Amino acid sequence: MGDPKGFMKYAREGPKRKPIELRVLDWKEMYEPIAEDKLKVQGARCMDCGVPFCQGSTGCPVVNLIPEGTELFDRGRWEDPTKALHTRNNFPEFTGRLCPAPCEGACVLGINEDPVSIRVLEWNIIDRGFNEGYVEPVLPVVKTGKTVAIVGSGPSGLAAAQQLARAGHSVTLFEKSDRIGGLLRYGIPDFKMEKWVIDRRLEQMKAEGVEFKTGVTIGKDITGEQLRKQFDAVGLTMGAEQARELPIPGRELKGVHLAMEYLTQQNKRTAGIAVTDEPITAKGKRVIVIGGGDTGSDCLGTAHRQGCLEAHQFELLPEPPPSRSSSTPWPLWPMQLRTSHAHEEGCDRQWSISTTKLTGHNGQVTKLHGNRVKFEGGKFTPVPNSDFEMDADLVLLAMGFTGPVKNGLLDSLGVKYDQRGAVSVDESFMTNLDGVFAGGDTKRGASLIVWAIAEGRKMAAGINQYLQTGKSAKQSVK
C-alpha cells in the first residue's frame, strides 16, 4: 500500500457525473474524467487487508485482485494493474462502468467509513491500459482441433468464448441480433456505456480467433440438434429474457410497453440503425415507469433525454432505509436507499404502489390506476382508501425478468430446468444433455453483469475439461 494511513487521511470520491443540464442533452457517457492524482488518492484509501472481503464470497464474484491491483496502480505502472485485472476478469471495462460493485459493499473500510472507490479505479485502469496498448490478443500455444458453439453474445457468452479460444479451441459465437453484445448492446443506454467500448474488446477477440455470426436464431435458423452434430460442445448463454408481465386490465393499450422494447429502440437510434417497428418515444409525454430497479432507472434516463414532459417511478416494495439495513449486515450487499443518475435528473419516485388497471381513449393509454399497499404476513395487502389515478401517455414495465425464454431452443433440446425455471446444470455447468452446457443468466436467472462474466468463465472451464477428457467434472468423479 502506498500510504499506510491513506484510509484515515482521505475521503472517498466516486466518479463525478456531468452537470444535469448538460448530460441530458446527448447520449454520451455521463461521467467526467478523473485526474490521475485524484485516482491515486482513492487508491491510497485501500487498507491492503489481511483478509480482503472485497474479493471474498460476499464481494466480487470474479474474485478480482483488488488490493494487489490497487498496489500496482499506486506504483504508477499501468501495465501491471491492467494485467492483474485480466487474470480474473475478461471485461473490466464493462464491470467498471456497469457493475453495482458488491466488492465495495464488502470493503472492510466500509464498516465505519465510506468504502474504497474500487469501481472507478477498475474503470480507469482498464481504459488507460487500452490507451497505452497493454491490452493485446492472447493467442493459444497450440490448437486442439475441437469446436465449440456459444449461443448468445452477452457478457457470459463473450467471456466463455474468449476463455475457450485462448485454450486452443475453435469457437463460433451465435447472436440472433444484428450486432454482437446482447443486453450490453441494446439494453444498456449509451449514457452508461458507449458501444465503442464493446467494439474495442471485440477486435481483440476476433484477433484471438473467435468467429462471430449475427442474425442467426438457434432453434429456428439452425436447430439445436444440428448444432450438437456440427460442434464438439455447445454453450447456452442466452440470458434471462423472459420479462415479468403485468396481467391487469388495459395492458393491451397503445403506449404500454416492456422496458426492453423501449430501450432497444433508443439504443438502435443512437447507433444510427433504422427502427422498423412502431416508434416508442417519451418526447412530450407523461411517463410512468413501473419497477424500481436498474432497468427502470435506465428507462427514466432515456425518457429525460428524449424530452419527456414528466416522469414517475412506482415500486411495489417498501422504501429502503437511508443506510445499511440490519437485515444485510456487513459484508453482505447492503439493502439501502440509492439515488441513481436518472433520479437526480428529475423523477417523482414512490414506493409501496400497486398498479391495478390502465384505462385509455381510442385504444391509447391515458391513465394509470393504483393503490398503496403494505407488506404483512408475507403478502401485499391494499391500504384502505388509498386508491388513486394518474395521467399517463407512456407506461413502461420494468419489473425484472423471470428467467430464460424456454419456448424455442431450450424446450426443443429437452434441457431440464430447476425450481426457479433456469436451466439445470451439474458442477461443471453441463446440462442433462451430453456436451451441452449452460451459464450466465440462462443458468442463474437474472443477475449482475459481474456474475455473468464469472459464470461464463466457469462454464468455459467445464467445457474445456469435457473436450480434453470426454467427461464432465461429475462424470470424472464416478
Task: Describe each model-derived feature in a short phrase.
Residues 4, 13, 18-37, 42-45, ...:
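C-terminal catalytic lobe of FAD-dependent flavoproteins
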Residues 5-32, 44, 63-75, 82-85, ...:
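Beta1-alpha1 glycine-rich phosphate/pyrophosphate-binding loop at the start
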Residues 23-42, 64-97, 101, 112-142, ...:
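Ferredoxin-type iron-sulfur electron-transfer modules in oxidoreductases and energy-metabolism complexes
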Residues 46-60, 95-99, 103, 107:
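Short cysteine clusters
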Residues 142-143, 147-151, 199-248, 356-370, ...:
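Feature captures the FAD/FMN-dependent oxidoreductase FAD-binding
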Residues 143-156, 282-293:
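Beta1/beta-strand and adjacent pyrophosphate-binding region of the FAD-binding site
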Residues 252-284, 376-446:
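FAD-site-proximal beta/loop scaffold in flavoenzymes
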Residues 296-300, 442-467:
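A conserved FAD-binding loop/helix module that cradles the flavin
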